[in-house]
Amino acid sequence: HLLLNKLGLITFYGPNFLNDIAELGNNMLPYTLKYFLGFFNLENLMKIVPSKVWYEERKDFSSKSIGTERICHQELRGFELLQGKKIFSGILMGGCIDSLYSLISGDRYPDEKDINDKYELVPIGKKWSGKILFLETSESKITPEDLEIKLNMLKDKGIFNYINGIIVGKPQDEVYYDEYKSIYKKVVQNIDLPIMYNVNFGHAYPRTILPLGINVKVDANKQCIQLLEQPLYNIGEKSNG
C-alpha cells in the first residue's frame, strides 16, 4: 500500500481473498460484501457506518468447517470517540501497526528498515500534515504493553504532531478492547487530537474498505466516515476527458 501510494496510486485496505471472498460459510459476510460491491456500485463505498454485528475468528479452517457460519455477536458500541472533536477530516493513511513497526524498526526483517529508510515508505514529519492516521492490530493480538511500545515509536517520529486525527480498527475478537483504548489515550497525550475507535476495518470481522490517499470526513455524531472524493472513476469517461 505505502509503496503504491507513494507512486500516486489509490489503494484499498480491506477484504482479502482467503478470509473474505473465500469465506467458509455459505456467503461472504453481509457487511463485508456490501463494501466489496462498492467496487462495482460506488455508492456503497462512499459512506462507512458501523456494522450491527461482529464475528469471531475461526478456530478451525479445515474442510470440516465448509458451510459452517462464524460465531456472531451483536455490536453494542458502534464507532467510539475516545477524545477530541466529534467531526474531523483529512486524507487517509496508515495500516496495521504490527507491520508499520516492523517496517520502521526492522525487528522482523532487517532489510525492511533499510528499504523504508531509503525510500521513505512511511512518511515522516510534516508529510503527515492534513492526514488521518488509521491503525489496527493483527491476528497476533499483541499485548497492551506491546501496543504501547509500537505507538511510542510513531510518537517519537513526530507523527502525532501533524495529523488531524486517528481512527482505530476493532481488535480481533475484541481482545484487549478496553486496554487498547487506555493505551491510545495514554501515548497520544493530547486530548485535542481526535481518536475514533472500534471502526470496522483491519483484522476483525466484518470489515469495510479504506482507500489510502482519499480525503474523508469522520463524524462521531452521525456515526459515519464519509468519503469526500471518489476513489474510483469510469475509465471510459476518464479517457474521453
Placement of each model-derived feature along the sequence:
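C-terminal active-site/capping subdomain that shapes the small-molecule cofactor and substrate pocket
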Residues: T137, K141-N240
